[in-house]
């Protein structure tokens, strides 16, 4: 036996020796296989293979190797092979770096597989080894495998030998190596993970290789410089041309060969004579040569191009290196002789024979290649996630960082990268989060290119995997996790545009080239980019940029779509510069550091400012030029194709600089192009020479000079206009330009027509545009008014783009007095607007002249030009105009009556609304109105408003073109070097700019709370020139505007009266002030109260209807509308809605609808027609309007003509109603907040407001101001929109009552008559919802209705006797659609009569969310939100979306009406108001109804908001769903509910009330048009509402009332019609008539226990409030248990089996507390379930519990199937309590997470601020030195200072990007 053992050991030792000595790849594998077979080892058992091999091979040689390998493996990082036992790694490439990585991973215990596509190691190239590399290889036993390894002074090794050493070590350590296997690509885990849980795999060639089934967690690319794994971008480092030749000659190892000296890689430096002699003797000119002796004689030489050409190696000379060195251009024989000759000379002809070694292709091993450019990957690693499987992807070796061959960096840095990668895998296995992992890896990777043998640790013994042992000055937190988010790639990325963009943005500071920017380099780059542009000659960084053309050229070069360069005029420096500044700021986030005016006026623009500014363009664009795709913003409109465009600009991280830069552009580009074409046409072919010179200029000089002047003026006007258009790229403006002004191709054509009038084609003339925009076709009278007014008020001509109009403008004016004007066709307003532009130009030039005159340095040059311009303009306008102009500019700067809420999108208007001063208004109006004031129509009013508000002349401090709607730079602002706040000097480095103001960072504070502001998060009040933090903006704005305007109200009212009189004859309602009355609508996307500052239009895909009625004019209001409801002489039934809606829609609305609207619009007739309309006929105009207001209706509107009419009417009515407010300027107050008033709009159900309340500035200032504020927050929760009074109140801060027209008329005419059948569904009811229905009565309700005065005093809005037969309103037998809620004498429901400021808002939109929503809303109002939550909601666009959506969803759900038997509407008595006390607790809520009714009690600060969707909802949902199947009678119940409800109420005392609730699916059919993200938000919002609002709120008398029969109808959305097939059809007679029914389910419930209601209700409220509060924190009040009881069950409640639902007559029992309570519970869970059903709250009727999608009711049944069984109730109660507890905890956790995130971001912001401060201090010091202001400035080198300063600038730019990323988070 002993002999056998010895033999085995001897044999093992021999086999192992064979393995160690193997000299080829194949030989090594063969020896290894024999060894493992003989020793009975399993190489696949990687964990035990090495230990078993070690135990079986015990020879002394082997032991020496084991010792070395064990020593290496004893490092603590490896944990004896247990660090990465769960990790499987695939390494692509068997080169030195791939194998070195495999060895490290094997030491860590990972399963490692290496694939190598070759089976030979034939690379003879010799590597220079750094000392640490030699030490490392020795530690792996290199000397044991290759005895000559680094013998003596040798510090190099051939790649082949190195590969063999590492190959053998890897095999010994259990690495699985496959040769002749080629990696193709990574395969993602399949989607079907349930059946087969397959992770990441790879595709290989051959396809059937066993590795195809191998799943791995880590993949490492080590396959050379030409290959990188997908997802890594590469950067190129270019040097001067370098052509290398490598040659390998056979080494026969003779004595002669051994004597030859090697030549090191630094020969060139020390031996110049050698190269000179070589050239002289052989003609070979080399830059360098290296000779290493190894297995071959290895030569590497760097040859000069000319030498290669001279020797015939390169056949033809080409500038392109690739072409130069391609095989066809190289003579191979000459190359071989060239290499041999050089080698001979280099070795002094001592090598006896120079025979070429053969490469792996069997050819002489000589190669010539270009290493002019080297590549490096931008990132070292990334993480992919698919189907919950994570994959770590990394690069090592040349794939990661290509080396510079003479320095030996390839192997050295390759090994360092291998260690770093193994360290990362170790962290990965230990569960480090992906972002932290990537951040650390990137931090290390930044160090890698900087490593040299000198700057790494010299103590090689200490080297381990831990990077700290290798890099002396390691900062592994250099890169922050948030900077590497783009390296964490998930499938869902494309759904999140922000993340998507982040992913294509280079991480801040990862570029290692930023430090090499020098002023000279910057100049060169600028010269390259501006080459070929006319009039652009960049010779320096100062004077060359004065004209502004160079800046425009750079922008045009990369984004030609942004600037029409051809239209720019070299003489208009101010305009050009400002245009460039504005475009750069808006599109790229590059804030200006100087104004356009300063640029032009300075003899030499400030060099430092220019260097700083241009460096930002350089950083942004220095990569490959951007494709001229439309800006990334389109991504937000879900234009998927642009995703590609985005990824094509990977490094331009400025793209996202501030969220506010993202404005939806929709399809503006085509329009823009059209306009540019038009502009060019007008410019190049001045079509109307005679007309222009005679009429336009008002002088008959026909000379050439005059022609030149014409050109000049036209070009000036056109540029001004162009800039205006370009910078106000707002889509709706474009639409207005095209449609309102009637500008379009037709007009261009007509420009050549001789007659003056032909230029303004009449409406009936066919227009070429496919669908004549209805906006173009205003009745002529209207236009006349518009024209007249506009003459004085237009500024900047935002509405009149086409150039030919400039020519016509004057001629049109010269048509004469009002008589002619009155006869002008509708399109003339464009011309007149242009005249305004020209005048404005003149003013601008005058001011510029004055300013420039002060500048001595420029006086000589500029004065002359300006005089010319001024003189020319003067001659053009005639001196007669001057006084008016002056007056105009004065009055306009103060004047601007309100514009309709969503009036004009110009961000400027939205952002800026100056206080209107009435006195100035009057003169202007007097000047303009003149004789035709009586001819002014609604459209004119709107337009006037638009012009007053949105195009009023900007105070001049910037260029005239600054009318670019971007910002106004007031004259008093000071220069760019003066701080706007502290008035001290602000140096370039410390200069920030916003709204055209320049200031210090530390001075940029909220003027209320002095909080430091950031450029991405501030609000600006243009009127006062103050900056605010977003939360304070609304309050300040509202209050200040109230103060300012109180004095004006009277005069404005008088004016309005005057206008009303003028228009009374035409039946046009009061003034357009009412237009504006629509409360402030904001851009849906913007955070609720974020100011819509011009810079911050949010990129919201589509402004929604909400905008209009909503409230603040949004910066992007999609439409502006004027609705006039004539006060009416006609009876209720007649012309109820004689409304005209003037709409300018923007592209964001669906085109289909637009077209439909347009075609309908053509039929619109002048307003005075149809004095009496028996039916409510909505002018087709309304269609587009509805398009917005009910754009999101769930079902297509086109279902039937009726449908078309209806929706149109509704919004119109709403708007009309809201527009009734007399005080025009009030809206302005809200103009700025991006409150979510928008929701208000969509279906502003105009609730009957108090008829006669005068508009007091604010009934209760606190409530008004806060209400506005609150509204902003919770409009989402109020889809009921604040309309009529509320609308005005809330938005404007004071309530100006207005009654729905039909109500008003009804009042006027006594008992109402039947309403026309076509009244919009929901509209009337919405207004009448608060009305009581007395089953048998005919007139008004018997109980005494409060008089208007009383109402006013109550602050409650009440329904004025509405028309009787409400059923007719529902156009169909099914009252289901209606919305009336009948209330008992005592105010019943919260919304019944809420304080004007708030309550009204609820009812209005009842239709929207249905009562439920409404009620919820009211309930929500009671929600007490913590400040953090408020801010949270404010800050995230989500909340807006939620509002929006909520609102839309609500809007969608048309309330179903249940009318009592008589169907007569009774007037409610004292509608109740819910107090909104901010911290009201349970007891407070239980207060008597009287208290609830107190209008003033509503706490100003309180507004409910939609909290973010939290997991608790989801859980609740799931629970709820799980209960559904268990419910016994759900089917029968459903059927019961489904059956049509009785149309009459059971006869009962007047206080019987009906409640109808309907919650519509937010994501209904029409929603599909909307972007899905919004839908989600909608669901969130709706879910939240449902959760938060007590159901019982709905119709409970606030004071105990005697039990009364009540019919509660509950319309709940069904999750899908499939679920309740029975529910849908029966109630609706005609499906088409009630599209919403398709999405709604109407359920009837009776309420048995009315007596309990009041009590229940208060507890419900409190519980809800508590519940919501718990959303914020958790129930803090003492009664949670009790509440939860109320909420989730009421033991006493008796629910009758559904099947037994009693007929309505029998249902007159008191409401059972059960129902109320029950309903509530379901709400929470269900609401989360899906966007569709928001609702549920139970209006429980004893018989049935209504459920949306059966969940609620079924749940109720489940919990109380047998009212008698208390035990079941208890169980249910316990369950609910448990659920409630769990939800509370979840909510808390959610809150904590948000808090932590906020704190982390805050900390990072503070750090950034500190760093910026440090940079600023240093920058100011340098700037002073550069400007000669420092004491020692003369002694310092300016170039060096400038270089240093520029470096600081770049660093600061990085910080600012980082800061903006943080703010975006």
Swiss-Prot record:
Cofactor(s) it depends on: FAD
Chain residue ranges for the region called Disordered: 660-710, 726-777, 888-922, 1040-1115, 1144-1298, 1334-1409, 1478-1612, 1669-1782
The protein, known as: [F-actin]-monooxygenase MICAL2
Residue stretches making up the Calponin-homology (CH) domain: 516-619
Domains (record comment): The C-terminal RAB-binding domain (RBD) (1796-1945), also described as bivalent Mical/EHBP Rab binding (bMERB) domain, mediates binding to predominantly RAB8A, RAB10, RAB13 and RAB15 (in their GTP-bound forms).
Signal sequence segment: none
Region: Interaction with MAPK1, residue numbers: 1299-1338
Zinc keyword on record: yes
Top-level taxonomic group: Eukaryota
LIM zinc-binding domain: residues covered: 977-1039
Coiled-coil region list: none
GO cellular component, one term: nucleus
InterPro entries attached to this UniProt entry: bMERB_dom, CH_dom, CH_dom_sf, F-actin_Monoox_Mical, FAD-bd, FAD/NAD-bd_sf, Znf_LIM
UniProt-annotated binding residues for Zn(2+) 1: 979, 982, 1000, 1003
Binding site for FAD: 97, 116-118, 123-125, 183, 298, 398
Keyword rRNA-binding set for record: no
Pfam family, one: LIM
Modified residues (Phosphoserine): 631
Residue spans of biased composition, Basic residues class: 1768-1779
Assembly: Interacts with PLXNA4. Interacts with RAB1B. Interacts with MAPK1/ERK2. Interacts with RAB35, RAB8A, RAB10, RAB13 and RAB15 (in their GTP-bound forms); binding to RAB35 is of low affinity compared to other Rab proteins; at least in case of RAB8A may bind 2 molecules of RAB8A simultaneously through a high and a low affinity binding site, respectively. May interact with MAPK1/ERK2.
PANTHER family the record matches: [F-ACTIN]-MONOOXYGENASE MICAL2, CALPONIN HOMOLOGY DOMAIN-CONTAINING PROTEIN DDB_G0272472-RELATED
Gene: MICAL2
Residue numbers spanned by region Monooxygenase domain: 2-494
Biased composition, class Basic and acidic residues, residue ranges: 664-676, 1048-1070, 1364-1384, 1532-1542, 1564-1578
């Amino acid at each position: 036996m002993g002999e056998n053992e010895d033999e085995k050991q001897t044999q093992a030792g021999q086999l192992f020796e064979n393995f160690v000595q193997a000299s080829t790849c194949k030989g090594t594998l063969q020896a290894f296989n024999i060894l493992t077979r003989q020793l009975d080892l399993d190489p696949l058992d990687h964990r035990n293979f090495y230990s078993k091999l070690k135990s079986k091979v015990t020879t002394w040689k082997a032991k020496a190797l084991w010792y070395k390998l064990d020593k290496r493996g004893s490092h603590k990082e490896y944990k004896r092979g247990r660090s990465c036992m769960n990790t499987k790694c695939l390494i692509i490439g068997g080169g030195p770096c791939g194998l070195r990585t495999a060895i490290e991973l094997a030491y860590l215990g990972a399963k490692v597989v290496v694939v190598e596509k070759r089976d030979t190691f034939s690379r003879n190239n010799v590597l220079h080894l750094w000392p640490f590399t030699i030490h490392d290889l020795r530690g792996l036993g290199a000397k044991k495998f290759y005895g000559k390894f680094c013998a003596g002074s040798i510090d190099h090794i051939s790649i082949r030998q190195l590969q063999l050493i590492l190959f053998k070590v890897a095999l010994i350590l259990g690495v699985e190596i496959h040769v002749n296997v080629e990696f193709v690509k990574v395969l993602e885990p399949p989607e079907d993970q349930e059946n087969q849980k397959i992770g990441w795999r790879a595709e290989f060639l051959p396809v059937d290789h066993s590795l195809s089934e191998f799943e791995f967690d880590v993949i490492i690319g080590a396959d050379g410089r030409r290959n990188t794994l997908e997802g890594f971008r590469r950067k190129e480092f270019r040097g001067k041309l370098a052509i290398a030749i490598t040659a390998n000659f056979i080494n026969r190892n003779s004595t002669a060969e051994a004597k030859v000296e090697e030549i090191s890689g630094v020969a060139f430096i020390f031996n110049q004579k050698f190269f000179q002699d070589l050239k002289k003797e052989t003609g070979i000119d080399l830059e360098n040569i290296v000779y290493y002796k190894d297995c071959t004689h290895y030569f590497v030489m760097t040859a000069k191009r000319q030498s290669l050409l001279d020797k015939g190696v390169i056949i033809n000379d080409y500038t392109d290196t690739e072409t130069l060195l391609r095989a066809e251009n190289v003579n191979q024989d000459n190359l071989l002789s060239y290499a041999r000759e050089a080698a001979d000379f280099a070795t002094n002809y001592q090598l006896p024979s120079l025979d070429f070694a053969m490469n792996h292709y069997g050819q002489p091993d000589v190669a010539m290649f270009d290493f002019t450019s080297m590549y490096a990957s931008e990132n070292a690693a990334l993480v992919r996630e698919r189907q919950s499987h994570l994959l770590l992807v990394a690069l090592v070796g040349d794939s990661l960082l290509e080396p510079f061959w003479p320095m030996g960096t390839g192997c050295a840095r390759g090994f360092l990268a291998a260690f770093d990668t193994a360290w990362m895998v170790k962290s990965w296995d230990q569960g480090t989060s992906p972002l932290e992992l990537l951040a650390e890896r990137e931090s290390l990777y930044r160090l890698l290119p900087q490593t040299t043998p000198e700057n790494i640790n010299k103590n090689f013994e200490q080297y381990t995997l831990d990077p700290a042992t290798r890099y002396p000055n390691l900062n592994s937190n250099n890169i922050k996790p948030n900077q590497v988010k783009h390296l964490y790639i998930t499938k869902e990325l494309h759904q999140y545009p922000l993340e998507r963009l982040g992913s294509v943005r280079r991480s801040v500071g990862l570029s290692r080239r930023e430090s090499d920017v020098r002023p000279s380099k910057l100049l060169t780059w600028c010269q390259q980019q501006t080459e070929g542009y006319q009039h652009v000659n960049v010779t320096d960084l100062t004077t060359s940029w004065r004209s502004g053309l160079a800046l425009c050229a750079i922008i045009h070069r990369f984004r030609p779509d942004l600037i029409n360069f051809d239209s720019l005029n070299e003489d208009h420096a101010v305009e050009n510069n400002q245009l460039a500044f504005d475009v750069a700021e808006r599109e790229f986030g590059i804030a200006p550091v100087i104004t356009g005016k300063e640029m032009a006026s300075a003899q030499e623009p400030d060099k430092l400012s220019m260097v700083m500014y241009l460096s930002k363009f350089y950083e942004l664009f220095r990569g490959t030029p951007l494709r001229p795709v439309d800006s990334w913003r389109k991504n937000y409109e879900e234009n998927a194709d642009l995703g590609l465009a985005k990824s094509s600009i990977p490094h331009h991280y400025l793209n996202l600089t501030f969220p506010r830069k993202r404005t939806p552009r929709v399809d503006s580009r085509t329009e823009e192009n059209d306009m540019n074409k038009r502009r060019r046409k007008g410019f190049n072919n001045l079509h109307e020479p005679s007309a222009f010179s005679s009429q336009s200029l008002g002088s008959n000089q026909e000379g050439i000079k005059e022609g030149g002047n014409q050109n000049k003026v036209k070009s000036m006007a056109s540029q001004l206009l162009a800039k205006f258009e370009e910078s106000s790229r707002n889509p709706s403006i474009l639409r207005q330009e095209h449609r309102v002004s009637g500008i379009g191709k037709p007009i261009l054509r007509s420009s050549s027509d001789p007659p003056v009038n032909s230029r303004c084609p009449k409406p009936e003339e066919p227009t070429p545009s496919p669908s004549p925009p209805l906006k173009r076709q205003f009745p002529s009278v209207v236009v006349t008014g518009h024209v007249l007014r506009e003459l004085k008020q237009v500024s900047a001509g935002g509405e009149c783009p086409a150039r030919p109009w400039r020519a016509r403008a004057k001629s049109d004016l010269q048509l004469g007095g009002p008589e002619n004007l009155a006869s002008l066709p509708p399109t003339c307003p464009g011309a007149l607007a242009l005249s305004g532009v020209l005048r404005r130009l003149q003013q601008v030039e005058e001011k510029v002249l004055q300013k420039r005159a002060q500048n001595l340095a420029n006086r000589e040059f500029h004065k002359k030009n300006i005089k010319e311009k001024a003189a020319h303009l003067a001659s053009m306008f005639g001196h007669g105009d001057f006084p008016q102009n002056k007056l105009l500019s004065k009055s306009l700067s103060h004047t601007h009556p309100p514009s309709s809420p969503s009036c004009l999108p110009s961000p400027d208007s939205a952002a800026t609304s100056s206080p209107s001063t009435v006195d100035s208004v009057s003169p202007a109006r007097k000047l303009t109105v003149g004789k035709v004031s009586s001819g002014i129509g609604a459209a004119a009013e709107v337009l006037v408003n638009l012009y007053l508000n949105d195009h009023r002349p900007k105070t001049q401090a910037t260029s005239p073109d600054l009318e670019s709607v971007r910002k106004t730079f007031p004259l008093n602002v000071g220069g760019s070097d003066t701080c706007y706040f502290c008035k001290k000097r602000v140096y370039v480095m410390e200069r920030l700019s916003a709204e055209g103001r320049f200031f210090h960072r530390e001075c940029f504070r909220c003027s209320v709370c002095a909080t430091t502001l950031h450029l991405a998060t501030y609000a600006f009040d243009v009127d006062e020139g103050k900056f605010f933090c977003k939360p304070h903006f609304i309050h300040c704005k509202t209050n200040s505007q109230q103060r300012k305007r109180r004095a004006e109200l009277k005069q404005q009212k008088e004016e309005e009266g005057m206008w009303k009189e003028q228009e009374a004859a035409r039946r046009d309602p009061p003034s357009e002030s009412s237009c504006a009355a629509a409360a402030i609508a904001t851009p849906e996307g913007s955070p609720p109260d974020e100011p819509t500052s011009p810079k911050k239009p949010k990129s919201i895909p589509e402004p929604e209807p909400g905008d209009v009625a909503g409230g603040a004019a949004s910066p992007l209001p999609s439409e502006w509308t004027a609705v006039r409801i004539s006060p009416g002489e006609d009876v209720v039934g007649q012309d109820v809605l004689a409304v005209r809606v003037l709409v300018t829609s923007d592209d964001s609305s669906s085109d289909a609808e637009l077209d439909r609207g347009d075609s309908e619009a053509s039929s619109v007739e002048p307003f005075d027609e149809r004095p009496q309309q028996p039916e409510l006929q909505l002018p087709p105009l309304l269609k587009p309007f509805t398009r917005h207001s009910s754009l999101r209706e769930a079902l297509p509107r086109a279902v039937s003509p009726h449908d078309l009419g209806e929706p149109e009417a509704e919004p119109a009515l709403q708007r009309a109603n809201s527009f009734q407010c007399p005080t025009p300027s009030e809206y302005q107050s809200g103009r700025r907040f991006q409150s979510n008033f928008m929701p208000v709009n969509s279906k502003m159900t105009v609730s009957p407001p108090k008829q006669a309340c005068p508009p007091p500035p604010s009934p209760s200032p606190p409530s008004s101001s806060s209400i506005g504020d609150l509204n902003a927050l919770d409009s989402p929760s109020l889809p009921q929109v604040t309309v009529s009074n509320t609308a005005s109140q809330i938005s404007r801060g004071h309530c100006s009552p207005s009654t729905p027209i039909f109500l008003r008329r009804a009042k006027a005419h006594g008992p109402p008559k039947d309403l026309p059948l076509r009244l919009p569904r929901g509209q009337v009811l919405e207004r009448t919802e608060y009305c009581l229905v007395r089953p048998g009565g005919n007139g008004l309700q018997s109980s005494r209705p409060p008089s208007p005065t009383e109402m006013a005093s109550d602050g409650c809005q009440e329904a004025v006797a509405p028309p009787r037969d409400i059923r007719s309103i529902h156009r169909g037998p099914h009252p289901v659609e209606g919305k009336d809620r009948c209330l008992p004498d005592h105010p019943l429901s919260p919304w019944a009569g809420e304080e004007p400021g708030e309550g009204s808002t609820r009812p209005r939109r009842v239709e929207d969310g249905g009562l439920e929503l409404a009620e919820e809303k009211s309930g929500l109002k009671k929600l007490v939100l913590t400040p953090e939550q408020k801010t949270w909601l404010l800050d995230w666009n989500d909340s807006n979306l939620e509002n929006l959506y909520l609102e839309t969803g609500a809007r969608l759900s048309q309330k179903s009406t249940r009318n009592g038997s008589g169907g007569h509407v009774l007037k409610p008595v004292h509608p109740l108001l819910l107090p909104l006390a901010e911290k009201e607790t349970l007891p407070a809520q239980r207060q008597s109804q009287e208290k609830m009714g107190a209008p003033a009690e509503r706490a100003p600060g309180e507004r409910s908001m939609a909290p973010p969707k939290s997991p608790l909802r989801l859980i609740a949902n799931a629970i709820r769903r799980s209960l559904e199947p268990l419910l016994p009678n759900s089917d029968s119940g459903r059927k019961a509910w489904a059956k049509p409800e009785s149309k009459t109420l059971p006869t009962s005392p007047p206080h019987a009330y009906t409640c109808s609730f309907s919650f519509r699916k937010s994501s209904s059919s029409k929603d599909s048009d909307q972007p899905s993200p919004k839908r989600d938000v909608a669901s969130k919002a709706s879910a939240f509402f449902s959760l938060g609002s007590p159901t019982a709120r709905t119709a409970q008398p606030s004071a105990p009332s005697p039990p009364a029969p009540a019919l509660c109808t509950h319309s709940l959305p069904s999750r899908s019609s499939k679920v309740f097939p029975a529910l849908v059809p029966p109630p609706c007679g005609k499906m088409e008539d009630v599209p919403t029914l398709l999405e709604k389910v109407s359920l009837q419930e009776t309420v048995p226990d009315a007596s309990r209601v009041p009590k229940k209700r208060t507890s419900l409220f409190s519980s809800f409030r508590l519940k919501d509060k718990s959303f914020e924190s958790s129930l803090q009040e003492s009664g949670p248990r009790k509440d939860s009881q109320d909420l989730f069950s009421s033991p006493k409640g008796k629910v009758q089996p559904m099947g037994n639902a009693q007929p309505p007559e029998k249902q007159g029992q008191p409401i059972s507390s059960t129902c109320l309570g029950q309903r509530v519970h379901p709400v929470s869970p269900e609401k989360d379930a899906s966007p569709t059903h928001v609702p549920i709250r139970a209006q429980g009727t004893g018989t049935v519990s209504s459920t949306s999608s059966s969940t609620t009711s079924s749940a109720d049944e489940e919990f109380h199937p047998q009212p008698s069984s208390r035990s079941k109730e208890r169980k249910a109660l316990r369950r609910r309590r448990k659920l409630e507890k769990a939800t509370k905890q979840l909510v808390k956790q959610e809150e904590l997470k948000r808090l932590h995130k906020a704190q982390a971001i805050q900390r990072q912001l503070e750090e950034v601020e500190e760093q910026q401060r440090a940079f600023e201090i240093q920058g100011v010091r340098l700037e002073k030195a550069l400007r000669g202001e420092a004491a020692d400035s003369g002694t310092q080198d300016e170039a060096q200072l400038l270089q240093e300063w520029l470096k600081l600038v770049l660093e600061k730019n990085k910080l600012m990007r980082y800061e903006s990323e943080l703010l975006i988070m």
